[in-house]
Amino acid sequence: NDETHTFSAGPGGATAAWGLEPDAITIGKAIGGGIPCGAYGLSAELAERVAARDDLDLVDMGGVGGTLAGNPVSVAAMRATLEHVLTEDAFARMTALADRFVAGVRATIDRHGLPWSIVQLGARAEVRFTSPAPTSGGASAAAHDPELDDYLHVALANRDVLLTPFHAMALMSPATTEADVDRHDAAFADAVGALVAAG
């Protein structure tokens, strides 16, 4: 299971939230709070099979390594993130903020009768310029609207709010406050209102 984009579901990512039991799991830089790092885990059965083939480490076909493998800064970042961010308490707060974010965005979308949607996965929320929200990669690609995406990013940046690049998405963090979410909601409402007024 690749948790690169689903780790925001909770302390154990979508794997724990949905009760999955994968043979392998990968986690990207979210496990280090954005510092370049990653981790993977294996089921006992798969780990035994991998360990039985230590001869593969002698060739370029297997093994784990690289300039970031065991890097002390990456390891320290992962430890801090595991201890202070990827916890039940932190996720309860971050998910509540994402709920608030979604409610504010949805209110603006509904007020203007726009064919948009907002999707949430734990502490992550993303505006989609289609309704209902896409449920597959193909549908997501077909619904992509680069002009609306660019407009929203620039309009919000001009109102002192930054969204995640390449998506109209926000990720709540332990540092995010209700005031931050409310500031976004006001800026989003103003930007969307200006877009609707311009026709």
Predicted regions and their residues:
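Conserved N-terminal phosphate-binding loop of PLP-dependent enzymes in the Aspartate aminotransferase
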Residues: N1-G199
